[in-house]
A protein has these predicted regions:
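A short glycine-rich, Lys/Arg-flanked "PGG" loop and its adjoining helix->strand segment in the class I
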Residues: 127-139
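Residue-level detection of beta-strand scaffold positions
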Residues: 57, 109-110, 133
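Short, charge-rich binding segments
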Residues: 102-104, 134-135
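A conserved beta-strand element that flanks and buttresses the S-adenosyl-L-methionine
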Residues: 112-115
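A short His-aromatic
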Residues: 118-122
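Class I (Rossmann-like) S-adenosyl-L-methionine-dependent methyltransferase catalytic domain
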Residues: 1-103, 142-217
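Local beta-strand N-terminus motif with an aromatic residue
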Residues: 36, 108-109
Length: 217
């Protein structure tokens, strides 16, 4: 999606990482999850975790902005749009745009939202994502929200302009935003949007927050 922030255009779709750069820890978490059935990859990007999800769950929905879904790019070594790639590689999988999220009639046992909030420079859109997660979860479903908040790579952002949870960085070609969302920040956002915290922890510079719709201690 494109965001206009103080006269600067930020294209969040450019933040998506390829399947060659997964978190091995998150891959293992998905594989060992006690959840099964139906899953949603909320902010699927370049299908970084698609193989892990389709191997684990009976049906998977991949969701991202219409701009991300419709552009031709290299997806797992294939030049295609995301819907084209999914149609030719995965059974029992479908694709929905963020803009059409309200048309989804299913609810999900598991929702993955990995490195999505950190790419959004707009609080109202972040709230829209979290509200969408709550709406699409089953009553006993769980969502895993992951954000990287510490890395030497981020040092360059700190010379940029402070904005929301992070910084806007400009070079000669484009502008980008990265939010540094630790456990506390993510939990606060989720609680503000009526999600319950099931668990949270940090590992190797990333925050992991598991949320649900029910009451949890």
């Amino acid at each position: 999606m494109n965001y206009e922030i103080n006269g600067v255009t930020i294209r969040s779709e450019n933040a998506a990482k390829p399947h060659t750069m997964p978190s091995n820890y998150l891959c293992g978490y998905i594989k060992e999850s006690i959840k099964n059935g139906r899953a949603l990859d909320f902010g699927c990007g370049k299908l970084r975790y698609s193989e892990q999800l389709v191997d684990k769950f009976d049906a998977v929905t991949f969701l991202d902005s219409r701009k991300q879904l419709e552009r031709v790019q290299i997806i797992r070594g294939v030049k295609a749009t995301i819907p084209e790639y999914i149609a030719s590689h995965y059974e029992n999988a479908d694709v929905v745009s963020f803009e059409d999220m309200n048309q989804i009639t299913n609810n999900y046992d598991f929702i993955l939202c990995a490195n999505v909030l950190s790419a959004i420079p707009c609080k109202s859109t972040i709230d829209q994502v979290i509200c969408g997660i709550r709406k699409l979860l089953k009553s006993d479903g769980e969502a895993m929200i992951v954000n990287q908040y510490k890395c030497s790579y981020f040092k360059r952002y700190e010379i940029g302009v402070k904005h929301l949870y992070g910084y806007i960085y400009q070079n000669s070609h484009n502008s980008s935003y990265y939010g540094l969302l630790d456990e506390g920040v993510v939990k606060k956002i989720c609680i503000e949007n009526n999600l319950s915290i099931i668990g949270s922890w940090s590992k190797a510079g990333s925050s992991y927050v598991v949320v649900g719709k029910g009451k949890h201690i």
